[in-house]
Amino acid sequence: MLNLNELKSGFHYFVMGWHFITQKGLRRFVIMPIVLNTILLCGLFWLFISQISSAIDWMMNFIPDWLSFLSVILLTLSILTILLLFYFTFTTFSGFIAAPFNGLLAEKVEKMLTGENINDDGLVDIMRDVPRMLAREWQKLRYSLPKIIALFLLSFIPLVGQTIVPVLTFLFTCWMMAIQYCDYPFDNHKVSFDIMKNALGNQRTQSLTFGGLVTCCTFVPVINLLIMPVAVCGATLMWVENYRNDLGFNMNRSFSSQTGLDVRSENTGIVK
């Protein structure tokens, strides 16, 4: 069921992400994710251009002759599916490569919001955390990969693969974008992946709204170069205002998808 308050708050956190990347104390931590994002997007664009024609021909071969009158619509949906599959590839690589930098950016944003240090700032401490961050990215990949494979297999089914699959793929992409970027502040506090996933699922409309805006902006030229640090900043604000008090200092507590959070933001007035 659509929750209008969560819809509003998801939009709010995305907009606030743009505000934070302009803050003086955060700019130097924003630069590296932007550079990495630019390199990865250029590589993705080259791969997409070189493979899109053959990929479209392959998908259209599964459309029966009696549906040829819908070829334009089905072609559009097929292209959307291919775009989203390429997008999964991009987010997977970017997650592994940029994880240490995004984790550090999330730390700095949280410190700006709360005035409290999370971890030591020494280079040795940061390097010590890198294996844990990469293991977390691998955990996200293990969570998403079976679903991606299932969507890929469904795309072989005539009509279903060109109509329902694009919608499911888009919704799953929105969900994964919320998980991808919210995970950085959660992981900084060593909150487990399952607890994080269930917490986000408890406010699913907010998560899907935030993830949907991130997904859409990834396909907009120029804006997509900035979207990674924007999403990290917005997700960190979401963590501080929704989950930090409940999870950040009570890691041993079991958090199920049925648990309700009633967190009110003194800064924004948004009520969940």
From Swiss-Prot:
Membrane topology recorded in Swiss-Prot or TrEMBL: Multi-pass membrane protein
GO cellular component: plasma membrane
InterPro entries found in the cross-reference section: CysZ_sulfate_transptr (IPR050480), Sulfate_CysZ (IPR022985)
Keywords on record: Amino-acid biosynthesis, Cell inner membrane, Cell membrane, Cysteine biosynthesis, Membrane, Sulfate transport, Transmembrane, Transmembrane helix, Transport
Transmembrane helix is among the record's keywords: yes
Ranges that cross the membrane: 29-49, 66-86, 148-168, 219-239
One matching Pfam family: EI24
Subcellular location(s) per record: Cell inner membrane
Function of the protein: High affinity, high specificity proton-dependent sulfate transporter, which mediates sulfate uptake. Provides the sulfur source for the cysteine synthesis pathway.
Protein's recorded name: Sulfate transporter CysZ
Source organism of the structure: Haemophilus influenzae (strain PittGG)
